[in-house]
Design a protein with these regions (language model features):
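Predominantly soluble domains enriched in secretory-pathway, periplasmic, or organellar proteins
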Residues: 4-433
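Periplasmic c-type cytochrome electron-transfer domains
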Residues: 151, 232-233, 237, 246, ...
Length: 702
């Protein structure tokens, strides 16, 4: 939904008059959660309602201000270390055991068939993926480590069995096992598919550039399937008899991101591919609401020869499933079944269909739990699922045994404790449909969550029309907002209190629902898993929860700085050039709107190489630097360069493909700086080729 936030601000939909809110002491947590129930139960005049909302907004601004005064912005923990254990990935080890990844706790866990934890092993570098080879070796990868760890299972415990070095790689986001002990790994930062032979003298057999935002990889017989989130594509590669990656066999390309897929080989050698993603249609903002961003599942068939073809597609948002990330495909006896659960909603679907037929699937719907990030079919017919939102593993009974709900197995970690209940509620508002519970999928209207456009809080690779004039903008990350105000490219939201109020309005726009609404917890029983036991959650409590979450929804640790404490010679020169040419706008501040928070040059390395990487690299002013069309009459608010490498495409209008392209376009003199469209003026100069590489190397660290 914070398509809402990112789009509203970037796009410039001013939903309410900007106000300066008073700064007094915040109300108590319990008062916030109970606020406004009485007034909603009693008739009020419009003036009374307006007064109540204004008073609530003052209290919310108060709450934010008090938290801001108490916050050490240099040491605000990265989000990947402050939101619980985060069960994230699963793989089958043998008939009685599974292995899983706790992304938040950065650990590998051994599980029994009931998903009870038998062993936990810490993994350096933020564990994210696990794969089991045909011989039973277990490999685990981390987002900020250039090595894979290998374990062997002795029947009771996982035993360390060495590691595989991957020089030149910042980290791995996904893993799959291949024939003959080979591995396939996706490097998110480099956008590469690595073919690895752990037993070889040169373990990296090939590093192939595949595209932007690779998030998952799976081998299906002699085919390898890769999901490129930011390129909005799923690619099918051929594998030779030795398991080496060959030619691209097929590509599915959509207008928006594909969040997950599954695939199965049919008896006649055809590949059945199921993909889950946003509606294959441009985002439509022309009517004020977020149009054509429903969640869909798509079914494709790839014959042994010839091109891939779509069999059918189904809008699952209208059936109650939003942002499905882990579709699970079953094929048996000439029939197919697709299990789909949403990350952003509390329903699941079973779609029954003939594997080669374009006929619509028969749909069976069931209540479920939100937050599903991974799913794995078990020999028992049960389904094991990873649920970072609820910080739990889930075990769904086998098909036909739905009298019992899914079993919830909570997971905790001392080093990454669960967030406060209020903050967890805010996380649910961000990642589920709670912020706009009455949206529909009628016409171009959509049921969505913030994550529909901001995958895991970052971006979706889109450049979309704002619905205003001829302004097109790239999606912006929604992490790190607390110290980066005024918010968004138009800078119309002075603080998170204003942001939260506007987001409830824009998220539900078009649903004819008053954005000042309450939630009855009986309609969302899973809220109890977050520690929410209030019978009713009033509008102020909901906004406060969203603010509390956004305050701590910081950026993850930058993989480029892990294990380091100083610049290379190239990065040092880049830092000096940045200070001379860029830092007057992209200031080294810990709070973008507080000039006094800027760090001196000699303090940059310590801040950059810290786990927090807290410098915002922004300021609160508007600038006109040639990146057009401008989103505001005064230009565009200076954007944050924090984790610039995680955002693609670059610039507000998405016109730069790489960071070095962004740097090479720059033209400047002692008083002026243009990112694009510089006037033909001989006094303006560009960075030299060496300087451009040096500045880019520095930007990679931010």
């Amino acid at each position: 939904m914070l398509a809402a936030i990112g789009c509203v601000a970037c796009v410039g939909v001013a939903l309410c008059t900007r106000q300066v809110l008073s700064q007094s002491h915040s109300t108590a947590h319990a008062q916030a959660f109970g606020f406004h129930e009485a007034s909603r139960a009693s008739p009020v005049t419009p003036l009374d309602a307006a007064d109540a909302i204004a008073a609530a907004r003052e209290r919310l601004a108060d709450f934010e201000a008090s938290r801001r005064r108490a916050t050490d912005f240099a040491h605000l923990p990265p989000a990947n270390r402050s939101h619980g254990a985060d069960p994230y990935a699963l793989a089958r080890l043998d008939a009685q055991h599974l292995v899983g990844v706790l992304r938040g706790a950065s650990a590998l866990v051994l599980l029994d068939a009931r998903l009870r934890e038998l062993q936990r092993i810490d993994v350096p570098g933020f564990a994210v993926a696990v794969a089991v080879s045909d011989s039973g070796e277990c490999w685990v990868a981390a987002e900020a480590s250039h090595r894979l760890l290998r374990f062997r299972f002795d029947g009771q415990r996982l035993v360390p069995a060495g590691q595989l070095e991957l020089p030149g790689t910042q980290g791995i986001h996904a893993l799959a096992s291949g024939p003959r002990g080979l591995l396939y790994a996706l490097s998110g930062h480099e956008g590469e598919l690595l073919t690895l032979d752990p037993a070889g003298a040169r373990p990296v057999l090939e590093a192939r550039r595949v595209g932007h935002g690779p998030i998952s990889v799976r081998r299906v017989a002699s085919l390898l399937v890769v999901d490129l989130l930011l390129d909005h594509s799923v690619i099918v590669f051929e594998l030779n008899e030795q398991g080496r990656v060959g030619e691209e066999r097929a590509r599915v390309h959509h207008d928006g991101p594909i969040w997950g897929f599954d695939a199965a080989l049919l008896g006649d050698g055809q590949l059945l591919l199921a993909a889950a993603g946003v509606e294959d249609h441009a985002l439509d903002r022309s009517q004020g609401f977020f149009g054509n961003v429903d969640s869909f599942v798509f079914c494709y068939l790839l014959p042994k020869s010839g091109g891939i073809r779509e069999l059918w597609r189904r809008n699952v948002s209208e059936l109650g499933v939003v942002t499905p990330k882990a579709p699970l495909l079953f094929v048996a006896n000439g029939q197919a079944r697709l299990f789909v659960a949403g990350y952003g909603s509390d329903r699941a679907l079973q779609l029954y269909f003939e594997p080669t037929s374009p006929a619509d699937a028969r749909v069976q719907s069931e209540p479920f739990l939100p937050g599903v990030a991974a799913a794995l079919a078990l020999p028992s017919g049960e389904i094991a699922l990873a649920d970072p939102l609820l910080d739990a593993w889930l075990l769904r009974p086998a098909a036909g045994e739905r009298s019992e709900p899914a079993e919830i197995i909570p997971v905790t970690a001392e080093q990454t404790p669960l967030a406060a209940t209020e903050e967890r509620l805010g996380e649910a508002l961000f990642f589920t449909t709670l912020m706009a519970p009455n949206n529909t999928s009628e016409g171009s209207r959509s049921r969505f969550s913030c994550e529909t456009c901001h995958f895991e809080g970052y971006v979706d690779g889109r450049v979309h029309y704002t619905g205003r004039d001829d302004v097109h903008v790239a999606t912006k990350p929604l992490r790190g907002l607390f110290n980066n105000r005024p918010h968004f490219s138009r800078a119309l939201d002075a603080d998170l209190a204003t942001v939260s109020h506007h987001e409830f309005r824009v998220a539900g726009k078009g649903s004819e629902t008053d954005p000042w609404f309450s939630i009855q917890s009986e309609h969302y029983p899973w809220l109890a898993q977050l520690g929410v036991f209030d019978e009713s959650l009033g509008p102020e409590a909901l906004r406060r929860a969203l603010i509390a979450f956004l305050m701590h929804f910081s950026h993850d640790t930058n993989p480029a700085v892990v294990g380091r404490d100083r610049f290379s010679a190239q990065e040092q020169r880049g830092a000096s050039l940045f200070r001379e040419q860029c830092a007057s706008c992209h200031a080294a501040r810990l709070q973008s709107d507080v000039a006094e928070s800027a760090l001196p040059f000699d303090a940059w390395p310590r801040a950059i190489f810290s786990p927090e990487g807290a410098i915002v690299w922004a300021s609160a002013e508007y600038r006109k630097t040639g990146v057009t069309p401008y989103v505001h009459e005064s230009g565009t608010r200076v954007p944050s360069l924090r984790r610039a490498a995680a955002k693609w495409p670059h610039f507000t209008n998405g016109s730069a493909d790489t960071l070095i392209e962004l740097v090479r376009r720059a033209r400047f003199d002692q008083k002026r700086f243009f990112h694009a469209a510089a006037p033909p003026d001989a006094t303006l100069r560009a960075f030299t080729p060496d300087e451009a590489r040096e500045v880019t190397a520095f930007l990679e660290l931010l």
